[in-house]
């Protein structure tokens, strides 16, 4: 199977059905709430609320607008949040609508790419439909802050599409579009560095004419981006085990990814920063899967180029998230499958097409296709229900990670926001049992006690917070207010004097100084 120079035009009905399917499976997440990182990246992010902050967006990490540090430089994602805020302010429906539209756009780009390469609208349609409906993508779609995956996928696919088109074009227009798409992809997410490898895969798989100059320019753009990320735009890298300790984790992840694609059950938020032995059964299984996939790809290179291309796509697209260069605490994430999964769906779609092409099994193939899509759609709709409600999401995550203090803290915050103080206190206390050194959790617990009028417990928790984090300004201020309310004048004055030594220019401390109340 080779690249078709004059591929037939996209079928309007196929495009329409992909769009309808996308909205059908994600319509129930449109009224979901802000959750997890959405507060830092959207709700509490001052930068997205004015276009005057555009230079800040383009030069700083993702969390800078809310005062937090981040290892990620994804300005295009932040620009989409700026557009959303301009249109909807903080109406969460608009943000979820944008995520859904981005996912559908990525599916249409999948359809376009497969149609160009393999000249088969049924194959392209099935691949895109499986992609848009599979529940493993809910984290990238139902989660507002997860849109970097769909955004980068759109431009990675467009970069490949325009590059392939430029090979048979005498005009530079399509090649310029390929370069621009590459730039936009890199500004969306770090995994876009894989673009040159995917281009080489295309040339190697289909033996198309290689134009060194065109490939060089795209490669230089990617190398320039990598150089900037390692120097000028460098962020702090989380403390992480050395490479040989992380490798078993990749094979465990590979085994899990295979399970999630084939049997997409037990989907949940985060899988943790765990270390594995190379003798772990899942690591051995993952290694066996990797060896098997590579062996099949090599053997099928000449016999079945689609199989070779699909497997190679899957493995190459996983490379940026294989923790070879650690930029994240987790050994795996469900949304990391967003781009690699295209290879899996392409093989599955081809199998369904072959079954349909045999007259004997045509009706069985149609029934099987509808069943698979319906199965995916039902699981996606079910998974969206967890993402709609933060309490449901965190409680589900705790089923798989019961010792996660992060989930317990977030659960406590949600309970507190709903005035469920008893449940919030229980969540905070359990988080502190797991990790007693969490100043932020003590602060959350203290503010909850304070709002409930329990000054004694509030003081105990807030004093522990400032003990663990001597520079915790908010904890000082709230503790000072509780001291004032509890008529502990000397403690309040001493606390604020200490804060003034730590942060002498802090206006909030001066305004809230108990001296104003006790003069």
Q: What residue spans do the PLM features occupy?
A:
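Residue-level detector of bioactive/disordered segments in secreted/extracellular proteins
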Residues: 6-10, 485-486, 517
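Register position in tetratricopeptide repeats
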Residues: 417, 451, 485-486, 519
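Terminal, low-structured helical/coil segments at or just beyond the last alpha-helical repeat
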Residues: 493, 501-519
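Low-complexity, intrinsically disordered tandem-repeat tracts enriched in small residues
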Residues: 439-441, 461, 486, 494-495, ...
């Amino acid at each position: 199977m080779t690249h078709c120079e004059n591929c037939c035009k996209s079928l309007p009905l196929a495009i329409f059905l992909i769009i309808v399917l996308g909205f059908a499976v994600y319509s129930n997440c449109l009224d979901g709430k802000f959750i997890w990182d959405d507060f830092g990246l959207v709700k509490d992010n001052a930068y997205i609320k004015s276009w005057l902050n555009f230079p800040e967006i383009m030069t700083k990490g993702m969390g800078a607008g809310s005062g937090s540090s981040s290892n990620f430089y994804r300005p295009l994602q932040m620009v989409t949040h700026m557009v959303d805020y301009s249109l909807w302010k903080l109406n969460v429906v608009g943000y979820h609508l944008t995520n859904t539209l981005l996912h559908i756009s990525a599916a249409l780009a999948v359809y376009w790419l497969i149609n160009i390469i393999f000249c088969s609208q049924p194959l392209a349609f099935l691949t895109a439909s499986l992609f848009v409906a599979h529940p493993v993508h809910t984290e990238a779609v139902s989660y507002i802050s997860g849109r970097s995956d769909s955004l980068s996928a759109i431009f990675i696919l467009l970069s490949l599409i325009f590059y392939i088109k430029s090979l048979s074009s005498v005009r530079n227009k399509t090649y310029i579009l390929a370069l621009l798409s590459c730039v936009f992809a890199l500004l969306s997410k770090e995994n876009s560095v894989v673009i040159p490898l995917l281009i080489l895969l295309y040339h190697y798989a289909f033996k198309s004419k290689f134009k060194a100059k065109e490939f060089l320019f795209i490669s230089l753009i990617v190398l320039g981006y990598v150089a900037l990320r390692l120097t000028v735009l460098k962020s702090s890298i989380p403390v992480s085990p050395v490479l040989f300790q992380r490798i078993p984790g990749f094979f465990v992840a590979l085994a899990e990814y295979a399970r999630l694609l084939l049997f997409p059950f037990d989907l949940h938020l985060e899988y943790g920063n765990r270390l594995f032995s190379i003798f772990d059964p899942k690591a051995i299984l993952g290694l066996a899967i990797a060896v098997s996939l590579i062996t099949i790809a090599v053997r099928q290179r000449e016999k079945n180029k689609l199989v070779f291309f699909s497997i190679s796509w899957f493995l190459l697209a996983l490379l940026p998230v294989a923790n070879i260069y650690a930029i994240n605490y987790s050994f795996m994430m469900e949304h990391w499958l967003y781009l690699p999964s295209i290879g899996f769906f392409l093989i599955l779609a081809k199998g369904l097409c072959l079954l349909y092409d045999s007259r004997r099994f045509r009706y069985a193939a149609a029934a099987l296709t509808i069943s698979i899509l319906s199965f995916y759609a039902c699981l996606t709709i079910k998974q969206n229900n967890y993402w709609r409600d933060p309490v449901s999401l965190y409680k589900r995550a705790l089923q798989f990670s019961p010792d996660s203090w992060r989930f317990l803290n977030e659960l406590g915050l949600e309970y507190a926001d709903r005035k469920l103080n008893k449940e919030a206190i229980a969540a905070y206390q359990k988080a502190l049992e797991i990790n007693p050194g969490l100043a932020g959790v003590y602060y959350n617990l203290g503010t909850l006690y304070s709002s409930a009028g329990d000054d004694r417990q509030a003081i105990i928790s807030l004093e522990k917070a400032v003990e663990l984090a001597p520079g915790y300004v908010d904890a000082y201020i709230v503790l000072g207010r509780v001291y004032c309310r509890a008529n502990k004048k000397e403690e309040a004055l001493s606390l604020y004097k200490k804060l003034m030594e730590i942060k002498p220019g802090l206006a909030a401390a001066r305004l809230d100084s108990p001296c104003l109340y006790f003069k």
